């Protein structure tokens, strides 16, 4: 609530994340094996936030953008390939070639709070390194975590 700017994210139970696919509806039981298998094949991904931005939408959204790496794009592409094979197609702006990776830090801001929120982010210490450590399914509005799986390296049997 710095400088009078409030985002409902903490109140609705949201935590920092990067959405790699969004659906109007999806059966959690159908997606679970794919996410679990994908998580078992991936090491945690190092990420660095490189920019702060906003979407050209009616509701005020402020986000951090990670530096796009081959590993992040591979995770995104791999998940979509798995879900496409099940006949599950994500919303178009989350599809490969259209996706803008981002970590939302504020939503539903009044127009006059967007610029101050961008400035707060720009001057903060959020631009260091971090790790993408898990993949999961979350219901949104209201936020309800369904399940998540830690990313870990695939260990070959010797």
Model-assigned labels for residue ranges:
Residues 37-67:
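Hydrophobic, well-structured mid-protein blocks that either form specific transmembrane helices
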Residues 22, 68, 107, 134-139:
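Short, structured patches in soluble enzyme cores that scaffold and shape functional sites
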Residues 1-46, 71-129, 146-158:
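Basic, often amphipathic N-terminal segments
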Residues 50-59, 96-98, 134-144:
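Short proline/glycine- and acidic-rich turn/helix-capping motifs at secondary-structure junctions
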């Amino acid at each position: 609530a710095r400088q009078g700017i409030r985002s409902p994210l903490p109140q609705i139970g949201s935590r920092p994340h990067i959405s790699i696919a969004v659906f109007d509806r999806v059966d959690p039981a159908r997606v679970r094996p794919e996410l679990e298998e994908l998580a078992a094949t991936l090491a945690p991904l190092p990420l660095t936030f490189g920019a702060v931005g906003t979407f050209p939408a009616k509701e005020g959204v402020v986000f951090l953008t990670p530096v796009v790496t081959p590993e992040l794009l591979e995770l995104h592409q791999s998940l979509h390939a798995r879900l496409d094979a099940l006949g599950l197609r994500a919303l178009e702006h989350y599809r490969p070639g259209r996706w803008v990776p981002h970590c939302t830090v504020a939503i539903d801001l009044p127009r006059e709070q967007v610029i101050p929120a961008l400035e707060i982010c720009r001057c903060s210490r959020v631009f260091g390194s971090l790790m993408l450590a898990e993949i999961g399914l979350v219901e949104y509005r209201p936020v309800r975590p369904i399940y998540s799986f830690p990313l870990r390296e695939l260990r070959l049997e010797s």
